[in-house]
Every structure is written in C-alpha cells, then in structure tokens.
Amino acid sequence: MRNIVKSYIEKNNWECEVYPSPFAVFFNKDEKIYVEPDISVICDKDKLNDRGCVGAPDFVIEVVSKSSRKMDYTTKNALYSDAGVREYWIVDPEKERTTIYYYEQDEAPMISLFTQTIQSGIYEGLEINISELLK
C-alpha cells in the first residue's frame, strides 16, 4: 500500500512524503502525545523534525490487528479528527473492509469492501483495491 501511495505522489509531483511505521506523529509541541501510523503522508515539510511529524499528517492509513483494533477505531480516530488529518483509512483484514473518513467533508465514514476500489478524497486519481494487494 505504501508503494502505491508513494508512486502516486511521485508521479503527480506532489510536495509530499510518505512514511511507514515506525514514524512518530506528535500532536502537541512538547512531543508527549504521539502515535505511529502504519502509513503517513505529510505535505507540509515544516511539520517534520528529527523525531517525526509535529502536527497532523494529511493522510493516514492504519492496518488493524487484534491488539490495535480499539486504538485504531476509537482513540486514533478521535486524535486524527481533532488534529486536522484530512483523510483516514482503517484497513481491517479480519472484517475484509476499509473504513474511510474524509474529515474535511464532515460526513459519516464510508465503508468499502476489500473487493472494491477505494478512491482517495484528497488525492484525485489515487485508487487502491485492497484485495489486489493481498494476492
């Protein structure tokens, strides 16, 4: 998934960086509250320092595991929404679906089955079919 996002960013000459975990995202300037998303896309390079990103990434993807389920669906969802993340995908292998939050649109989340192609709301033309990645 990271490679698809990275290729799309590079192909479209976006001034963004794609970071896989472990990469710290801090939600306050004292750098005490942080998470490590599975994939982060940061387009504002002023948010980057030697420890990670201070402030909200533009786009975050989390892949749910049994141990991270509650954190990904509730805690991180609230943190990302409050911090200003523009788009958040929760990829859930157990349920074979992806929950997509387009926070800028202030709408209910969209649910996409792994067999469906997901279109990014903030990156026109970025499409990912999770089932294709799992083959």
Question: Where do the model's predicted regions map?
Answer:
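Gly/Pro/Ser/Thr-rich low-complexity, intrinsically disordered segments predominantly at protein N-termini
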Residues: 1-135
